[in-house]
Structure formats: C-alpha cells, structure tokens
Amino acid sequence: AFGRVDVLINNAGLMPQAPLERRTLTDWDRTIDVNIKGVLYGIAAVLPQMQRQRGGQIVNVSSVAGHKVRAGGAVYSATKHAVRVISEGLRQEVKPWNIRTTVISPGAVESELPDSSTEADVREAMRAFYAENAIPADDFARAVVYAMSQPEDVDVNEILFRPTRQEY
C-alpha cells in the first residue's frame, strides 16, 4: 500500500564469537534470530510487492565468514552461510518476476559488529582486529551500488570482498 519497492538492502547481523564449549545458548538464539530470521522477514516484507510490480532487487548481506569458518565462529559462520543458501534459493524462485538477488559477503568493514559479542575477551579481540583491518563503510556501499547499477537483464549474484590486509 506504500507504492514501489525497488531495492531491499537486507543488512543486520550479530557476531558473538565464542568457542562452542562455552555453550552461549542465548547468544546462539539471538544470532540465529537476527542473522537468519531477520533476512527471511525482510524478504517476506518486500517480496509480494516486488512480485506485483514484476521487478526489484534484494541484496542480502552475508560475510566472508559464510565462506570460511574459524575456531570460535561456528555459529556466526553457519548463519552467514545460511544467508548465501537462502539467497541462491530465492534467486531461482523469483526469476519469473524479474527480481534480482545479490548476496554480498564482506570482510571486516567499519561498523558496530565487533561490539555484538557478550564475551568480554572476544569483544576486545574483535575490536582490536577491526581497528587494525577494517575498511570504511563506503567501500561496502560501492559494492552495493555496483550490483544495483547493472542493466536490468544482468543479475550480480554474489560479491565477496575484504580488506587487502585481512588474513582470512
């Protein structure tokens, strides 16, 4: 009832890194709720309108961690891999409506993400890593604009990028 929806930037995430043996069940639930269900709810909110208008673009934000898991990051990596899988399934489903789907998997980008860990030692380590490695949010924005600025018959399905100096 609000008119056209041309683009959804589906970008929300929590990154509570911790070894599985710590059994941070509350963090796991929150991470799954935000990183997976949040993406699904965003899609559900715009998909009917995009189908009616026979076009649009959904940009889901994953992470380098959705491609590679590190010790302490299994749950986060699993949720970000799920975003990639959801995005590919969505891409296959929405082709008849000319809806484009892109999944963007950034490495360390300046944001409040390192603050999302409830484990003090992990939070401080992530803050230090981001302080040394993170690239400006403008670099992320340029990746989004690249995907969005392609001709209507071109669908950039996946972009994986990270700071040059980032190890993984």
Q: What are the language-model segments listed below?
A:
Residues 21, 68-74:
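Active-site loop immediately N-terminal to the catalytic Tyr-X3-Lys motif
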Residues 2, 18, 45-54:
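A short helix-coil junction within the Rossmann-fold of NAD(P)-dependent oxidoreductases
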Residues 68, 89-99:
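Active-site-adjacent segment of SDR/Rossmann-fold oxidoreductases
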Residues 43, 79:
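Active-site helix of classical SDR
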Residues 63:
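Residue(s) in the substrate-gating loop at a strand-loop-helix junction
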Residues 99, 103-104, 123-168:
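C-terminal helical subdomain
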Residues 19-20, 27-32:
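Substrate-binding pocket helix/loop in short-chain dehydrogenase/reductase
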